[in-house]
Amino acid sequence: MAFLKKSLFLVLFLGLVSLSICDEEKRQDEDDDDDDDEEKRGVFDIIKGAGKQLIAHAMGKIAEKV
């Protein structure tokens, strides 16, 4: 009976350790993904701002011709 208790304890302990390692890796992956999303948003904002300036400049040129 004591052998079964020790075996069960060992199995549960090893399961918890592996579970905590997986959770830690998952959190690191999510943090990396968040950083990538922020970089993508930053690049998109720059492109969007440049597009607005380009359109405003083009509209100004069109208005000068009219």
From Swiss-Prot:
Which tissues does the record link to its expression? Expressed by the skin glands.
GO cellular component, as recorded: extracellular region
Say yes or no: keyword NAD present: no
> Where would you find this protein in the cell?
Secreted
The record places propeptide residues at 23-39
Segment forming the signal sequence: 1-22
From the UniProt record, give one GO term of the biological process aspect: symbiont-mediated hemolysis of host erythrocyte
- Residues annotated as carrying Valine amide in the record are 66
Q: Does the keyword Disulfide bond apply?
A: no
Keywords assigned by UniProt, alphabetized: Amidation, Amphibian defense peptide, Antibiotic, Antimicrobial, Cleavage on pair of basic residues, Secreted, Signal
What is its biological role? Has antibacterial activity against Gram-negative bacteria E.coli ATCC 25922 (MIC=80 uM), K.pneumoniae ATCC 700603 (MIC=310 uM) and S.choleraesuis ATCC 14028 (MIC=310 uM). Shows no hemolytic activity and no cytotoxicity.
Family to which the UniProt record says this protein belongs: Belongs to the frog skin active peptide (FSAP) family. Ocellatin subfamily.
Q: What is this protein called?
A: Ocellatin-PT4
Lineage start: Eukaryota, Metazoa, Chordata, Craniata, Vertebrata
